[in-house]
Amino acid sequence: MKLCDFEVGLDQPFFLIAGTCVVESEQMTIDTAGRLKEICEKLNVPFIYKSSYDKANRSSGKSFRGLGMDEGLRILGEVKRQLGLPVLTDVHSIDEIEQVASVVDVLQTPAFLCRQTDFIHACARSGKPVNIKKGQFLAPHDMKNVIDKARDAAREAGLSEDRFMACERGVSFGYNNLVSDMRSLAIMRETNAPVVFDATHSVQLPGGQGTSSGGQREFVPVLARAAVATGVAGLFMETHPNPAEAKSDGPNAVPLNRMGALLETLVTLDQAVKRNPFLENDFN
C-alpha cells in the first residue's frame, strides 16, 4: 500500500505516526515535529506527524480539549508548510471531515467510533488514507468488518479501496485498565490492511486519575518491542517535550528526548524480524 510518498507493509520497514496528543501551541508543535523529523531522517524511518485539534473524548468536562478546529488545523498546516511533513489528525464527527481533509494527509478515526457505520463511510469517502483504530471493546477479528465497511464505501464512491489501516490500541481489562494481546496484531492482518500498533494509548489507564486518565509510560518500550517483534507495518506513539506538563495524556507520553534511543532499538529489531518469512504463515 502506498501511504503519502512511501510504501507500507510487512515487506517494508515500519513507518511512524508520532507527535503530541493535542496541539498546545504553534511553537511547541513546530519544535516537536522538527525534532522528530531529524530523528526519523537519521534512522530512515518514514514519518507522519500527528496531533489533535480537539480532544472530544475527555474524562472530565473541565479537561483541556485543544485550540479549536480552525487554529489547530492552521498550525498543522504550518507543520506541512515549514517542515514538509505529512500530517495526520483525528476527526470526531461527519461534519468535520471535509474541512479536516482539506488540510491533512491522513485521517484517523477514534477507537470509540469504530462501529459507527455512517462515520466510517464518510471518512472512507473523503479520499484520504484513514487510520482506523480498533475499539477497546472489539475483538481483533471484528476489525475485518470495519475495514470492509470502509472499502465498500470507497468502492461505491469510485475511490481506491487500498487506503485503510487497522490500528490496535489495547483492550479493556476490568476497570481503568487496558492490556495488549500481541496475537491481535497477527489476527488483524486478515483484514489485508496494514496493521499499526499504538504503543502509548495501550499503556493508558482510562479515567484512572478520577478526572483524567493515568498511564504507565515505562511500559511503552516493552509493548513497542513486542509489537515490532510480532511484525507490524507501522507504529503510533505520542510524545511530549515535558510529559509532566502535557495538557492531555501526559502519563502515557514518551519523553521527546527518549524517542531517538527507543526508535533506534525498534529499527534494529524490525530489520531482524523482517529479514525472514513469518513462521506463523506455515503453522495452519
UniProtKB/Swiss-Prot annotation:
<dbReference type="InterPro" id="IPR006269">
    <property type="entry name" value="KDO8P_synthase"/>
</dbReference>
<dbReference type="InterPro" id="IPR013785">
    <property type="entry name" value="Aldolase_TIM"/>
</dbReference>
<protein>
    <recommendedName>
        <fullName>2-dehydro-3-deoxyphosphooctonate aldolase</fullName>
        <ecNumber>2.5.1.55</ecNumber>
    </recommendedName>
</protein>
<dbReference type="InterPro" id="IPR006218">
    <property type="entry name" value="DAHP1/KDSA"/>
</dbReference>
<keyword id="KW-0808">Transferase</keyword>
<comment type="similarity">
    <text>Belongs to the KdsA family.</text>
</comment>
<comment type="pathway">
    <text>Bacterial outer membrane biogenesis; lipopolysaccharide biosynthesis.</text>
</comment>
<dbReference type="Pfam" id="PF00793">
    <property type="entry name" value="DAHP_synth_1"/>
</dbReference>
<dbReference type="GO" id="GO:0008676">
    <property type="term" value="F:3-deoxy-8-phosphooctulonate synthase activity"/>
</dbReference>
<keyword id="KW-0448">Lipopolysaccharide biosynthesis</keyword>
<dbReference type="GO" id="GO:0005737">
    <property type="term" value="C:cytoplasm"/>
</dbReference>
<keyword id="KW-0963">Cytoplasm</keyword>
<comment type="pathway">
    <text>Carbohydrate biosynthesis; 3-deoxy-D-manno-octulosonate biosynthesis; 3-deoxy-D-manno-octulosonate from D-ribulose 5-phosphate: step 2/3.</text>
</comment>
<dbReference type="GO" id="GO:0019294">
    <property type="term" value="P:keto-3-deoxy-D-manno-octulosonic acid biosynthetic process"/>
</dbReference>
